[in-house]
Regions:
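Cysteine-rich micro-motifs
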Residues: 157-167
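Short, cysteine/histidine-rich loop/knuckle motifs that typically chelate Zn2+
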Residues: 141-146, 163-165
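A structural preference for long, well-packed, hydrophobic secondary-structure segments
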Residues: 138-140, 157, 176
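Short helix-coil boundary/hinge micro-motifs
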Residues: 1-141, 148-152, 183
Length: 183
């Protein structure tokens, strides 16, 4: 599997990493990094949210639905405008999941979600807390027109998302613009 299909876990939160499962979202050729149930299971494993019950094709559809409900709400939040009420309603449907229980083993752990729907509910709750709490001030959007990836930037110094390709393209474009001006 090529680099373009590799999951990204550098956006600053699990829900932001869910957004990154679709790369170059606004480009001509978006990259779906979670095209199958198996890839959804891999992703849920990586974020320690693998459900007890088997993940289905319907769960994959729900994961895509959550991701695409979150994206416009996150972009609106970063832009400082109210999100579309239909998207907020779509996101709200994921908030009715099971509650989280904790247990102590060699460390504090949460019990695994029973279903993929419960796992997605946990991700939605994290997103809502992030989007409505003080950490929303740390959210940024990649300026690359085909990316527009949302990421957390507590330092306030990052210009592009964590994807090195976006930063490289942006720097090359800026260099060419400076060079053209000096000629």
């Amino acid at each position: 599997m090529g680099d373009r299909m590799a999951f990204r876990f550098d956006s600053g939160a699990t829900w932001l990493n869910l957004l990154a499962t679709r790369g170059t979202h606004f480009g001509e050729h978006p990259v779906e990094r979670m095209p199958t149930v198996g890839r959804l299971v891999e992703w849920l494993d990586a974020v320690e949210l693998r459900p007890v019950r088997k993940v289905s094709a319907a769960d994959l559809e729900l994961a895509w639905e959550l991701r695409e409900a979150l994206r416009p709400v996150a972009l609106a939040t970063v832009d400082g405008v109210p999100p579309d009420s239909a998207q907020v309603k779509a996101l709200g449907r994921f908030l009715d999941g099971e509650s989280v229980s904790l247990k102590v083993t060699d460390r504090l752990v949460r019990t695994p979600p029973a279903t993929a729907t419960d796992a997605l509910g946990r991700i939605a709750r994290q997103a809502v807390d992030h989007l409505t709490g003080p950490e929303r001030e740390f959210l940024s959007v990649c300026p690359e027109h085909d990316c527009r990836g949302v990421f957390s930037d507590p330092s306030g110094r990052r210009r592009w998302c964590p994807n090195p390709a976006c930063a490289t393209r942006g720097r090359v474009r800026a260099h060419r613009a400076r060079k053209a001006q000096s000629e």
